Amino acid sequence: QVEVQIITQQPKVPLEEIEDVKRRLREYTDRVNKGESFSMLARLYSEDRGSAMRGGEIEFSGRGMLDPAYANVAFNLQDPSKVSKIVESEYGFHIIQLIEKRGDRIKTRHILLKPHIPEEALAAGCARLDSIADDIRNNKFSFEEAASVLSQDKDTRNNHGLLPNPNTNTSRFEMQELPPEIAK
């Protein structure tokens, strides 16, 4: 078994890219309001591959199983024929439609769009991570300190960068359980 610590930096997304995503989501909302099928639009345009092929459907979920921003809007939806306002989550930007509520669980469908990140922003993010790695190697600060102060990953920064194993609710992983991008 292994434990994994990570430091995450998000690349800067140009405002024009965010505005383009929001414009497209407003267009999809207008189309649904004019009678087009939300499910069909999700199949065609959503960038959530897992739910897109199911018409954007996310099975019954409790509030804690969803991104907090998504859950906040989704749990306040009342009318299944209405489309939510645009929601920004850690995954991108969504519009949401309520399918059904059962007690403290909801079933929704959504369309997710992610802003395009230019190559230069990715390169700048990589350079920043390389600089942090050099500072750690040169003992300017420990990995734990860097993760706590510099990481932008909300799930790990308050735990010194320790990656949680969602299968066991611990920080320990079998090698085959590691996400492929980490197991390399």
Where would I find each of the regions flagged by the language model?
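Short acidic-hydrophobic surface loop/beta-edge motif
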Residues: V83-S89
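Soluble sensory domains of the PAS superfamily and closely related sensory modules
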Residues: A74-S81
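Short, Gly/Ser/Thr-enriched beta-strand-loop segments that form substrate-interacting elements
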Residues: K184
